[in-house]
């Protein structure tokens, strides 16, 4: 839809600091998951290595494996706020490294990578002549914090593929609409695979996405709800001795450290039975994820239902047999 691409070009300039040609630099995709797959496909072959700051979105590891590549986790440290350093990247670099795959803001940790982390990443990518793929699905709710777009850093647009989604920020998950932004040269490398790999994006989904871009005021209620819920989660869950949760930096997720209580897989199963709540086991998010649980705070429209669930989790964890 040309109108959607034009609206996206305006948004990219205002929000992301990117000046793009809507017809040459934007590709509409049926959701960001297919967009990520498509972004990786032309650049990763059998045995090629992809550096993935971890914990990270599970599909990042899976997509690389499907293409015959080798996902290499760059394990980040909670004590550093899960920020990224040049030294961490260099420690994992080999002659087979082809790409860095970053989720920014991070899923599951909610980390917004700061300017120093992103500049270190940009310097690393340029020095080693790599491709950077960035998933920015959670960019819309950062609670006033600066959220830089790596492709906007000097020298990075030519070697960065940025994947965006309408599912997380605008609540259009059922419509399956996302988009890829990259240089002309990278787009030419990717486009030959587009129709056969990801198919078409529905017309109705594109119309809904355009309407959301033109009337963003509805997002104010989402922002209000997520602000309330992240603070309630922080307040309620940190009441449990041995449980540690940083105040979420972005989106509608929470990353809970339960390692002092015991095995995160067992605790996740326990909470289903004793709190009637299903949390994601951190082991699914790569190295550094074990001992953690991911909670989604955006399920209900009613804040009180979320608060009630948080209180059930708290009470169940207070009663959990300590290891």
Predicted regions and their residues:
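Phosphate-binding glycine-rich loop
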Residues: 2-49
